[in-house]
């Protein structure tokens, strides 16, 4: 069992910011096309986080041209260049699946009040 934890520990990333459900993030992905490499940015609301060792994931949702797009990212993926926090949201749930049914202004997440 210790051997597995040791191997998993080598692949963990500690450079990601602390974010939670409801936060708006920009995920910078490293895309390799043939011999070229480029960075693609995906910005949206975090609707789910599954924290685990190397199998942890988070789901980001955005609305593009009126169509909802959700993408699941592995937390410790080497293809994630960086994750930027845009805003912190104030929500009372850890899974924000109800946002899928809402449209327009109702689908907004209130910003967190900082005093």
Curated annotation (Swiss-Prot):
Give the UniProt keywords, A-Z.
Answer: Ribonucleoprotein, Ribosomal protein
Please name the GO terms that the record assigns under molecular function.
Answer: structural constituent of ribosome
**Residue runs in coiled coils:** none
User: One GO BP annotation here?
Assistant: translation
Gene3D superfamilies listed in its UniProt record:
2.30.30.790
Q: Does the keyword Ribonucleoprotein apply?
A: yes
A Pfam entry, by short name:
Ribosomal_L19
Q: Please give the GO cellular component terms listed in this UniProt entry.
A: cytosolic large ribosomal subunit
Q: What the protein does?
A: This protein is located at the 30S-50S ribosomal subunit interface and may play a role in the structure and function of the aminoacyl-tRNA binding site.
Q: Which family does it belong to?
A: Belongs to the bacterial ribosomal protein bL19 family.
User: What's the name of the protein?
Assistant: Large ribosomal subunit protein bL19
Source organism:
Nitratidesulfovibrio vulgaris (strain DSM 19637 / Miyazaki F) (Desulfovibrio vulgaris)
Provide the organism lineage as a comma list: Bacteria, Pseudomonadati, Thermodesulfobacteriota, Desulfovibrionia, Desulfovibrionales
Gene from which the chain derives: rplS
């Amino acid at each position: 069992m210790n051997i597995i934890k040791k191997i998993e520990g080598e692949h963990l990333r500690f450079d990601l910011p602390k974010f939670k459900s409801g936060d708006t993030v920009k995920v910078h992905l490293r895309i390799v096309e043939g011999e070229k490499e480029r960075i693609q940015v995906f910005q949206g609301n975090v609707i789910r986080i599954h924290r685990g060792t190397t199998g942890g994931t988070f789901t980001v949702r955005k609305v593009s041209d009126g169509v909802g797009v959700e993408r699941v990212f592995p937390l410790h993926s080497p293809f994630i260049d960086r994750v930027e926090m845009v805003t912190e949201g104030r929500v009372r749930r850890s899974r924000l699946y109800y946002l899928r049914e809402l449209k327009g202004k109702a689908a907004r997440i209130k910003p967190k009040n900082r005093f």
